[in-house]
Amino acid sequence: MSQHVGHGRRPRTPGPPVRSIRPFKSSEQYLEAMKEDLAEWLRDLYGLDIDADNFLRVLETGLVLCRHANTVTEAALAFLAEAPERAQKIPMPQAGVFCNGAAQPGTFQARDNISNFIQWCRKEMGIQEVLMFETEDLVLRKNVKSVVLCLLELGRRAWRFGVAAPALVHLEEEIDEELRRDLALPSPDPPPPIPPARRPCHFHNLDQMVQSLVSHCTCPVQFSMVKISEGKYRVGDSNTLIFIRILRSHVMVRVGGGWDTLGHYLDKHDPCRCTSLSHKPGSFLKPPGPPVQHEVKVQDGPSQPQPTMTISRSQSPLPPVDWKTYTSSSRKLRPPTPSSPGLRSEPPVRARTLREDPLPRSQEKPTPSQRMSSPGPQFSSTCRGPDLQSTLSGKRANRCPGEPPRGRTPTLWVHKEAGSRGTHTKAPTPQRLQIPEATSKRTSARGPSPPPRSSSLASPHMIWVLHQGASPQLSEPMTVHSSSPGKGLTKIPIRLSPARPPTPGRSSLGTEGEYSTGRGSISSRALEGNLDRSTHGHHSVEASGDHQTDIQTTSETEDPRSLGTQKWKERHTSLALGRRREQALYDNLKEEVVANMKLLEVGTAYTQGTRSQAIPRSGVYVPSLGGRWPEPGGPYDKVIRELVQGPPPLLKVDLKAWKVGSECLPRPIVDPGSPKEKLGSRETGTRIKASLNAEDTTVRTVSPARGQGCSTPPVSANLEAPTRSCSDPSSDKASVCLGKGKRTLRKPQKIPSIYKLKLRPRIRPRRDHRPEKRPSRIPKPLPYSCLVLARTAPGSRLLKATLGGKGGVPCQVNGTGKKEEEKKKGGSNISLESSIQPAESQEPLKLGGTPLSPEEESWV
């Protein structure tokens, strides 16, 4: 029974469409608001059970549309009878619409009703084609937007002669009236009817709703919206004015001739929302985060919790926005005091608030590879216990390494190690510095860094420059860049004077746990020179200055003569580190600093008259252990003398003699007047003395004695004779030209086509071993074998003449008559004392003297 009903001819009424649990995009919000308004409008007019969910399902039969068309026609005829003068200025319908009341959804009767309504809107109401829809748009839900816009335009036109209009039409009339008052425009000739009084909205104030929508963007510099009057705002950097109204639960914006939601309007015009999916409130990627907090509060005191930094930012896959956070260059963060029982703490100090740059998007979720393996400070945005979150500017991360942020004083982050925690302080430096790279594995914590800069961590030498009177708590290695990208980098730790006098009660012990905490501060482990002696990895600070000040950063920061008189021992108490070990460490450090500074000043030891020394012009160059500067002279003198004497003279070559057979020409020899010093290289080959005649093709090569000190003047070769012998195609003689002593492959004159080579694939025999399917044993026919012999007969003359390996006696390949045939064709004896390159008309020969078999021949 159920099968019979399921296969009936009459289609069943489709149920409600399945709604997605995912929230709709912001571009569909204004359609939902308009459908709610139109559904309420039709419910008030005809008492229908209609809302935004079943709006299209109620209209798909066309009955409600045709009924409304007939109602508008009746109201227009009544208005024409009451005010004929006003009716003449307004386009009014004259006829109604025929409707089939028995139409069911999806049938042709329903399509006919919708088609009749569309024709009535075009003919009687004069609605533009831009606002019209087709039958398929409503029946198959192809274009819901056109259906909504058409009904809204019909409500605007019908409202002129007394038909109730949707609430959006009334809001439009209010805005138009306000514009006419502001611009002092005359009222329209047929005055529009007075809109009904608006019901008070039970939602929040309009300004609060606008502020709530704008605050979805978590950037410090948000899209500006300035209130001009009630419901009127100026947006962005331009003078664009928008009108905002509240329609039920939606904040609508009057845009052009239609409406849009404020959220969708901001998504299209706010530059931050245009480039970020997380700033859109309707994004289904993740729920919106908490409101942004950009204040950083630091509290010092024994009873206060550890300093925390609260920065809530939304994740975004695209590049960060240009931050505009203005801070004074004199404001600094002093290192907070850890509240551990083993360390002293200062008296409570009032909490200070400092505006900090938000975290870059690439640093909010650190990967395990970005964290340090040592117990030093970590760069992490997640607050774990009492750890302090470090913030790095996303704007400076995208800049060039040598470019400081504009409008701010260049600052240097100096790290102070305290146990397993890492607290970071900020102090200004005169150099142009960058954000430190918080890695011990040569990977940056805030994203990828240039490979040449990260390679400087493995340099065997580090030059340490110490400022006098500096606190040992604020010391950090710094990487000095050279102007040449090919040179390496050199770490230079610079002691910076703190923002205030150091506290005696503070200690800064940051090793691997082998030393206990005490009253003083030990900075000797932060001053170890070589990487193999360091107990933990340091954070390097890249300092890039001008090209002229690169060397001055290392050589002029501190005079090496004053290093001996510098006060090396600080007032501190070490419980685990002995005096001997500490003194040895300082002595080694002092010797290393002096040695490195002497290496850097090696350029000043030479006089100005010596110009051939290879001292780098820019950058910092640190040679390896035991390395010295190259002595002046050496192999460079030969090159300089060769350049001073000028280029050697060249032979004049007749260009007309160079033709197609130019491959067979002998190489021209340098003029005998040039000595070996001009060439700058040793003689590795032998001089060839060649004489070529037009009648005789004999080639003689004479190699002089290798023990001679001077070069033998060779005889200039005639270039015209071999050209004629090599390029003449009518000559049948075997022409042999002079070639190099080096064995080279000759290039064939004509490369055969691969299609002309009869390549037959090798067929594997059958392996099925079935007696009835064995290959045929029929012998080959006799004509086939005769054809094979006839084809191979002309090819038997493959090798005509070859030279013997010892005495140069020609070998007989194809019988005794080959020697006479060779004499007829060659016409001359060939004697070679060097390697010979065969002519193109001859068959290939082996240089060793053994003939080539036909199987060894192959195409080049």
UniProtKB/Swiss-Prot annotation:
One of its GO terms (cellular component) is ciliary basal body. Residues 1-22, 281-459, 473-574, 697-743, 758-781, 801-860 are annotated as: Disordered. Interacts with ADORA2A (via its cytoplasmic C-terminal domain). Interacts with GNAS, GNAL, GNAQ, and GNA13. Interacts with MAPRE1. Involved in the cross-linking of microtubules and microfilaments. Regulates microtubule dynamics and stability by interacting with microtubule plus-end tracking proteins, such as MAPRE1, to regulate microtubule growth along actin stress fibers. Enhances ADORA2-mediated adenylyl cyclase activation by acting as a scaffold to recruit trimeric G-protein complexes to ADORA2A. Regulates ciliary orientation and performance in cells located in the airway. Residues 301-316, 365-393, 473-485, 724-733, 828-840 have a biased composition (Polar residues). SUPFAM superfamilies: Calponin-homology domain, CH-domain, GAS2 domain-like. Residues 431-860 are annotated as: Interaction with ADORA2A and GNAS. Residues 201-273 form the GAR domain. It is found in: Cytoplasm, Cytoskeleton; Cell membrane; Cytoplasm, Cytoskeleton, Stress fiber; Cytoplasm, Cytoskeleton, Cilium basal body. GO terms for molecular function: actin filament binding; cytoskeletal anchor activity; G-protein alpha-subunit binding; microtubule binding. Keywords: Cell membrane, Cell projection, Cytoplasm, Cytoskeleton, Membrane. This is GAS2-like protein 2. Its main location: cytoplasm. Belongs to the GAS2 family. InterPro entries: CH_dom, CH_dom_sf, GAR_dom, GAR_dom_sf. Residues 1-12, 758-768 have a biased composition (Basic residues). One of its GO terms (biological process) is regulation of cilium beat frequency involved in ciliary motility. Disruption phenotype: Knockout mice exhibit a high rate of neonatal death. Mice that survive show signs of hydrocephalus at postnatal days 14 and 21, along with mucus accumulation in multiple sinuses, and remodeling of the nasal cavity. Conditional knockout in tracheal cells lead to isolated cases of hydrocephalus, as well as chronic rhinosinusitis and accumulation of mucus in the nasal cavity, which is caused by impaired mucociliary clearance. PANTHER family: GAS2-LIKE PROTEIN 2, TRANSGELIN. Pfam families: CH, GAS2. Expressed in tracheal epithelial cells (at protein level). Residues 347-364, 530-549 have a biased composition (Basic and acidic residues). It comes from Mus musculus. Residues 32-159 form the Calponin-homology (CH) domain.
